[in-house]
């Protein structure tokens, strides 16, 4: 991953790097790889994440169609 440093502004470059890493999901990946996750736990986690995604998408779709009031 590469970030340009303009005018020796290291702080701005660090912020840009952190933003890129956040978008790419690197922080989440590092956190997940911190400890070993059993395959059964991984399947359960991924299934729960998929259910959450589907529910979120359905909720957004319902809000867009006016069936549910926005929070």
From Swiss-Prot:
Would you tell me the Gene Ontology cellular component terms? ribonucleoprotein complex; ribosome
Per the UniProt entry, what are the Gene Ontology biological process annotations, in alphabetical order? Answer: translation
Q: Keywords, A to Z? A: Ribonucleoprotein, Ribosomal protein
On the tree of life, the source organism's domain of life is: Bacteria
Q: Name one GO molecular function term.
A: structural constituent of ribosome
Q: Which Gene3D superfamilies match?
A: Ribosomal protein S8 (1.20.5.1150)
InterPro entries (alphabetical) = Ribosomal_bS21 (IPR001911), Ribosomal_bS21_CS (IPR018278), Ribosomal_bS21_sf (IPR038380)
Q: According to its UniProt record, which protein family does this protein belong to?
A: Belongs to the bacterial ribosomal protein bS21 family.
- Protein name listed in UniProt: Small ribosomal subunit protein bS21B
The species this protein belongs to is: Rhizobium johnstonii (strain DSM 114642 / LMG 32736 / 3841)
Lineage, opening ranks = Bacteria, Pseudomonadati, Pseudomonadota, Alphaproteobacteria, Hyphomicrobiales
